[in-house]
Amino acid sequence: EYIAFKNFASEVVLLDIKEGYAEGKAMDLMQCASLNGFDTKITGTTGDYSKTANSDICVITSGIPRKPGMTREELIGINAGIVKAVASSLIEHSPNTIIIVVSNPMDTMTYLAHKATGLPKNRIIGMGGALDSARFKYRLAEALGAPISDVDGMVSGGHSDKGMVPLTSHATRNSIKVTEFLTAERLDQVKEDTKVGGATLTKLLGTSAWYAPGAAVSGLVQAIACDQQKMFPCSTLLEGEYGLNDLCIGVPVILGKNGIEKIVEINLSDAEKAHMQESAEGVKKTNGLLEL
């Protein structure tokens, strides 16, 4: 929806295993075209990966969603098999594609996509940090009583309730550090509210959120498709960056036509470094449950 409404893609293909579902969604969206002023062609297919052939960018959202009370990690048993099969099928028909992984547990599913496809690290991207950062900025703006457009902030680390690392040392309001406006106690509350952002919505909705995740994905897709060279926090394979190796976890990256153009290493506070290490250990523990 967001990708079509932004009108930067010539074609979008929706694929689902539920008979007729993707076709119906595509038709419903296409009937918005004249009302919303976009020319993107949207089609749907039930399980026919040949319809996705030669895609520049593929987004994997496949798997079961969270239910109230579930952690993202509890989804691994079912979602790992699904993501592995989907990633392999996409690469078969679009060998030069860039893959964005949304399925949970997202960092582990991004790592699995690497292993299943053998693609270079710049072409496998996990979405989580972009969404978590949007939720962080929402909570910061709420605490500051400020417009969200005045606020900037980023979340690194794993895409899990315990693994997120909201970077308060880099959070600003109009380029002024938020520590000038908020007490340490208030900032701690902002961080906690950010970490449980997904769980809060799951409890309210009875399932996973969709508007903000969709907006986050469209931002990543647009940055790649339009070669914007924009910075987002994304899950990517680390090979020594931030002192971490052989795992996918959220860090700042530059996105452009080649996918991840650069991993950006920024200075973290001592507390943030410690939390990042703890987060990495949690991701590696979840990775250990994979049958590679």
Language model regions located:
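Short, well-ordered alpha-helices that flank and scaffold nucleotide-derived cofactor binding pockets
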Residues: 1-5, 27, 31, 88, ...
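Conserved S-adenosyl-L-methionine
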Residues: 5-11, 118-121
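Conserved N-terminal Rossmann-fold NAD(P) cofactor-binding segment
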Residues: 11, 15-55, 284-292
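Conserved N-terminal glycine/acidic-rich loop preference
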Residues: 21, 27-32, 56, 109-112, ...
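Rossmann-like NAD(P)-binding element
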Residues: 35-98
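Rossmann-like NAD(P)(H) cofactor-binding subdomain of soluble oxidoreductases
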Residues: 71-137
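C-terminal substrate-binding/catalytic lobe of Rossmann-fold NAD(P)-dependent dehydrogenases
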Residues: 117-123, 132-292
